[in-house]
């Protein structure tokens, strides 16, 4: 897929050493092209999102209120990607996109198979009443970019969305899956891309509605808090500052 605008210049940093001031969402970057865009879209909800790596120690995820798994060029059907399965057992809500969606399905007994690649807009049809789709219409456009698909679900999961690409008479099954009891969710599509009409609403449903994050984070507050940290750390010391290409 292609976002219609670039992510904000600010990149997500690793978790701060001090106790977090704001509720946080971890975005695990599997090498897909949109991990930082996911973090940007969550921050636009005034929720702090931070990029983590798949091989980060499980302790690095302490204190997060939820986890988002990004897409990846790897194939879930080939067991690529290097996700530490312990992450999927964290006692917080988890939402996967594309590759991340397939990893969620696999972890809980689902099956993933290689399929004909889908790329471009598709029509999403929502079913059921999962909170992940609260306020989202029954039909909307989403952005697809994948070569694997979830063909079977494990116990506790249900299909809450199917999709259809132009010219295809057969719906794509399991385009969205949910286990509301365990707070595990997956989207085969990319809600973070602007082509997904109600993607930001879906992200809000997850970060604020399901994870319970308070929307307290802003860029202005971030700058103020970081300046205060630097002043405290550098008090009475010389400072060596690198800027831009430095």
Q: What are these regions, as identified by a protein language model?
A:
Residues 81-97, 102-200:
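Pocket-forming structural segment of enzyme catalytic cores
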Residues 237-246:
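Phosphate-binding active sites in nucleotide-utilizing proteins
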Residues 10-11, 18:
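Eukaryotic N-terminal low-complexity, Ser/Thr- and Lys/Arg-rich leader segments
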Residues 25, 142, 184, 239-240:
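Conserved hydrophobic helix-helix packing surfaces used for dimerization/oligomerization
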Residues 1-9:
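Extreme N-terminal basic, low-complexity initiation segments
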Residues 16, 22-27, 32-102, 108, ...:
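Flexible gly/pro-rich beta->alpha loop and the following alpha-helix that scaffold active-site loops
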Residues 30, 71-72, 145-147, 189, ...:
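Fold-independent oxyanion-binding glycine-rich loops
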């Amino acid at each position: 897929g292609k976002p219609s605008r670039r992510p904000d210049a600010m990149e997500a940093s690793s978790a701060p050493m001090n106790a977090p001031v704001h509720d946080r969402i971890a975005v695990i970057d599997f090498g897909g092209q949109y991990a930082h865009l996911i973090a940007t879209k969550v921050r636009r909800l005034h929720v702090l999102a931070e990029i983590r790596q798949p091989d980060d120690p499980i302790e690095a995820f302490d204190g997060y209120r939820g986890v988002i798994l990004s897409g990846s060029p790897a194939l879930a059907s080939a067991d690529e990607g290097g996700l530490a399965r312990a992450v999927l057992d964290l006692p917080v809500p988890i939402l996967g996109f594309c590759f991340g969606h397939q990893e969620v399905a696999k972890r809980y007994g689902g099956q993933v198979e290689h399929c004909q690649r889908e790329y471009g807009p598709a029509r999403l049809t929502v079913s059921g009443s999962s909170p992940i789709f609260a306020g989202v219409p029954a039909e909307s456009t989403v952005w697809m970019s994948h070569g694997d698909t979830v063909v079977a679900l494990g116990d506790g999961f249900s299909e809450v969305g199917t999709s259809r690409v132009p010219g295809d008479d057969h719906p794509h099954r399991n385009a969205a899956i949910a286990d509301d009891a365990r707070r595990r969710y997956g989207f085969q599509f990319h809600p973070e891309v602007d082509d997904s009409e109600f993607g930001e609403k879906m992200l809000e449903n997850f970060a604020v509605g399901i994870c319970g994050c308070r929307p307290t984070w802003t860029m202005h507050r971030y700058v103020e808090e970081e300046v205060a940290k630097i002043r405290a750390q550098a008090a009475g010391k010389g400072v060596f500052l690198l800027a831009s290409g430095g």
